[in-house]
Amino acid sequence: MLIEQFICRKDNFGVLIHDEKSGMTAAIDAPESKAIHNALKRRNWTLHTIFVTHHHHDHVEALAELKQVYNAIVFGPAAEKNKIYHLDQTLQSDEKLLFGSQSLLALSTPGHTLGALSYYFPEKKLLFAGDTLFSLGCGRLFEGTAVQMLNSLKKLCKLPDETLLYCGHEYTKNNALFALTLDPHNQKLQQRAEEVLSLRAKNAMTLPVTLGQEKATNPFLRWNDPAIRKNLSMKDSTDEEVFAEIRKRKDNF
């Protein structure tokens, strides 16, 4: 499977997935028509399918035009069918389906929105997490609760460490600076932050990254880490309390 990643709008990631065996191409979300058109033209691919992660405008704005031009079929969360225009097929929580020759899981990951989905290709170990999980961060809780988001992240953490993570936004630099305030002595985080700053200085993208690397560096996946709990003065707090405090601090960072 081939992947084309590019920047849309200001800081959205556009992602195209091409299944070589079937010749089919899918987009993860539809943030901007022009950038997606250009990427398809660059690779000489035709768009067949769009997988929507959630209903926010910056992820669905180009649906109408892409459907009109390519006659693409749009899949998205059943829980948000009344908020996403142009949906052709709805997906239930943790539904299994096929894209070309590849099996795909639509994982229910509420928190950022109540119906948010993350798409996982188990054979290729590829995760497209939308705005649920970012590199060194996670999505804001616009609709869901801290408990819901924590449970969603725990679900994603069960995937193999070698899984490659793609997400909805290039937020990694700011996330790295925040992560260092909570976990300043984490050498793996220090190395990742240095790498991120170097990449962004060259206007290069910071994803994909392995899930294993995120588990070692992302404070939103490290609610059990003794050093982070000590820095928060929350040694004996619950996972939910620690996660909620980290999210609160990031919101105000």
Swiss-Prot record:
Keywords per UniProt: Hydrolase, Metal-binding, Zinc
CC cofactor: Zn(2+)
Record field: catalytic activity: an S-(2-hydroxyacyl)glutathione + H2O = a 2-hydroxy carboxylate + glutathione + H(+)
GO molecular function, one term: hydroxyacylglutathione hydrolase activity
Annotated binding of Zn(2+) 2, by residue: 58-59, 131, 169
Binding site for Zn(2+) 1: 54, 56, 112, 131
Enzyme Commission designation: 3.1.2.6
One Gene Ontology term from the biological process aspect of the record: methylglyoxal catabolic process to D-lactate via S-lactoyl-glutathione
Cofactor note: Binds 2 Zn(2+) ions per subunit.
Pathways involved: Secondary metabolite metabolism; methylglyoxal degradation; (R)-lactate from methylglyoxal: step 2/2
Keyword presence, Hydrolase: yes
Protein origin, superkingdom: Bacteria
Cleaved signal peptide residues: none
Keyword flag Hydrolase: yes
Biological role stated in the UniProt entry: Thiolesterase that catalyzes the hydrolysis of S-D-lactoyl-glutathione to form glutathione and D-lactic acid.
Assigned protein family: Belongs to the metallo-beta-lactamase superfamily. Glyoxalase II family.
Subunit description: Monomer.
Protein name: Hydroxyacylglutathione hydrolase
UniProt lineage: Bacteria, Pseudomonadati, Pseudomonadota, Alphaproteobacteria, Hyphomicrobiales
